[in-house]
Amino acid sequence: MWAACASKLYICVFFLCVASLTSLRAQTLPLSHGERVDYDLYFKWGLIMSKAGLATLSVKESEYQGAPSWHYNLLFRSAGVIEKVFRMRDTMDCHYSKEPRLLFSSKRTNEGDYYLVDNLQFEYQGSGRIDIHSHRHTLKETKIDTMLMAKGRVFDMLGATMYLRSLDWRTMSYGAEFPFMIAIGRELVNARFRYTGQQIVEHKEAKFRTRHFYIDIYDEAFTQAKEAAEVWIGDDENHIPVKIRAKLKIGAAEVYYKDSYNLRAPLTCRIVVQKK
């Protein structure tokens, strides 16, 4: 049971994770070289809410195949009861061009004696087709080595977060939908973000103004396709995830903002409560 829960917690982390839309123009990625955001992860089951992990998202300017890029990095490690029964030390990297387009993704899974690498390389054809080389391997053998082809918006799971952060809220209306696909192994999983307006998020002693989105994910790891997960993005110029909640077959996974450094703009979405 714990192995399954840990795996799904990791899926939730990816949504902490570009082109312009038909009716909504995407703005410049709200990133800053050296940006870092820390998160706490929890497993929630009824009244039980236990610490399950820690995650760090960081961004820096880099190069990919000789061209300028944004390097987006996710570090995840288990904690609490998950750490005791199913230790995880996982990393994910992706490179975005300055256009921006997702160019390359690498996920390294380190779970005790189990080590796995998932690489995705994206090539954009003039016809609008995207060719994706998916290569999955362990230290001893290749598990998957195949080509995926798609049209539209296709990302790795971390890159989907960059897509959400790029959206221009100034012209967004309630109920707006943003479909995309996620490349995983041999599969292209259909998903979409749905905008439902502004909300206040509270966690411990902190409050944040946010924009709320549902995530519809058509994958058997989630209890239902519609509203399988939710994400609350800080309502300021940084567009960083403040809270994420994913329904699991047993309970739910929740991710909360903890701290941030070197953001592009002040974190004005945080509501400062005057002490009496």
State each model region's role.
Residues 24-125, 166-276:
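Acidic, serine/threonine-rich low-complexity disordered tracts
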Residues 8-9, 143, 233:
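Intrinsically disordered, low-complexity peptide-like regions
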Residues 8-20:
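Bacterial N-terminal signal peptides
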Residues 120-162:
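Hydrophobic, well-structured mid-protein blocks that either form specific transmembrane helices
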